[in-house]
């Protein structure tokens, strides 16, 4: 569906950047939430599970901080809103629901509001 501009409306380089960010969200961020959502797969005792979750949250803070830095002076991850932005928004919603502290990520606050306000995004979420 190239007419849907799922990876943005920019040139090939910008679309490649959207693919890159989609991959980062999928491989790096989403995978840490898998730990938070199912710590029993990684540890048996409740104490060990709590440690695993705390570690995943700490890793997520670092990953989201890197995204926050990238967003400085940008509206979206690449040129125009893309599926990578929608995916990141989903993980930001997970962060809020699971208690990942992103209070230091000021760019992400504005970004989350901006992407959430997009009418096409609102339709799918």
What does each model-found stretch correspond to?
Residues 18, 67, 85, 115-121:
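Residue-level signal for nonpolar/aromatic packing positions in well-ordered secondary structure
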Residues 1-2, 26, 72, 96, ...:
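Hydrophobic/aromatic-lined pockets within catalytic cores
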Residues 11, 54-55, 99-106:
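Structural helix-adjacent loops and short alpha-helical linkers that scaffold large soluble proteins
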Residues 1-54, 58-62, 68:
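GST-like domain detector, emphasizing the conserved glutathione-binding G-site
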Residues 3, 69-80, 119-124:
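Surface-exposed helix-capping loop/turn segments at secondary-structure junctions
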Residues 32-36, 76-101, 109-115:
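GST superfamily/GST-like fold recognition
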Residues 107-125:
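Long hydrophobic alpha-helical segments typical of transmembrane helices together
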């Amino acid at each position: 569906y190239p007419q849907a501009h799922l990876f943005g409306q920019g040139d090939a380089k910008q679309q490649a950047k959207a693919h890159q960010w989609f991959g980062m969200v999928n491989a790096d961020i989403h995978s840490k939430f898998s730990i938070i959502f199912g710590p029993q797969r990684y540890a048996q005792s409740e104490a060990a599970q709590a440690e695993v979750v705390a570690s995943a949250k700490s890793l997520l803070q670092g990953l989201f901080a890197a995204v926050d830095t990238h967003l400085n002076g940008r509206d979206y991850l690449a040129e125009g809103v893309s599926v990578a932005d929608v995916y990141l928004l989903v993980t930001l919603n997970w962060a809020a629901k699971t208690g990942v502290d992103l209070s230091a990520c000021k760019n992400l606050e504005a970004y989350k509001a901006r992407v959430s306000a997009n009418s096409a995004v609102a339709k799918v979420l």
